[in-house]
Structures are given as structure tokens and as C-alpha cells.
């Protein structure tokens, strides 16, 4: 029987000299689009890095796509798409050449989706990656992540360098292409996650509140305060 949650985080703790991610717990239901927000330094990226096994946690347990950290294998990792602020590709390759590379790497690679996204995001197919601006690099990273039909997609501040129009194209593409799959968007701008099924607000005391955009505004807590500041 397939588990109801794509991600289960229980008591995740990571301590640095001047910062502690302190026993945070949350679940991400399968097939949902979830936002994780919080002020700078709240630990959003630290949490995601621990979930992906990129840093060693100090305490807690994590289950991703039904696998614990110890059970995680290459086949499961190939079902996960990740876009970080600063994602990189070989500088000498163009998006057109990258298409050939990813056709070999991903069994589920969809070049029709890929080239459609390149066009929508105004990315040149023949230009080398090393000649791309930061915003163009982020657009390409997102196009790649969405084109191999990840079962679980994580975007960590992936749209922070994009203009409003490009961000809207990306958000609409996520909603369309990830239908029935799971996506987690880590963001500082609330506009990035307003349409998410569920939003988690991370603070220095862990998950402060959760709910939809409308529910959190009605509650009048930390999310509503951040929303008012951004208006």
C-alpha cells in the first residue's frame, strides 16, 4: 500500500555555532504542492539540505518517498528533482546539447516539455551555459527539473532571480506538469507560494503555522504579518 505522505519529517534538528534548527516536524501529502517560507535565517535551506542528505542532521528522522535515509537508493533519487539557487551545468554545453545528455540519463525525459519550456522562458537553445546570466541559469535548471517528470520536486529559492512574468510561467508550469505529483517550494517571497495547497511557516521555534494562503491570512499570525509587510 502506497504511503499517504511523500515526505515525513519528525524532530529534525541541526545545530551550528550560531543557529539551531530545533526539532521541526511536518508531513507533505503525496500529490500536493507545498510552500515552505520564513524570514532569512529561519532554516529553510538547512532543512531541505538535511532532507536530501546533503548535510548530517543531529537528531530526528526523515522518510522521503517511503524510504528512510538508510534505505535511500539511486533508483529513488532518480525520482527526485531538485533546483537550488546556484544550480550548475557544464559551461561549454548549450540547452540543445543538454537535451541529448539528459535523454541518456533519465528514462522519463520529455524533450517536448523541455523545448516548450525553453521557448516559454525565452531561453536560446544554442547559447552556451557559461554565457547565461543568473536568471537564465535558474530558468534552465527549472526547465530541466520539470522535463524528467520527477515524482518529487524541490525548488529552493529557485525563482528568486526571475522577473514577475517568468516566475508566473514557472508557477503555472509546476501546477500543470506536477499534477498528481509532489512539489515543495522554498521561498522568501510569499507571492511564490500563494497558490500552494499547503504553506508551512518556519521560524526560530520550528513550524509556527500551516495552512492555505486564505487560511493563514484569516488566522492573522506570522504569515499574515509577513504578507502585510510585503504589500
Language-model-detected regions and their locations in the chain:
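Conserved beta-strand
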Residues: 9-12, 19-29, 60, 170
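Helix-to-loop junction immediately C-terminal to a conserved catalytic motif
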Residues: 52
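ABC-family P-loop ATPase nucleotide-binding domains
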Residues: 82-140
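ABC-family ATPase nucleotide-binding domain "signature/switch" substructure
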Residues: 132, 155-220
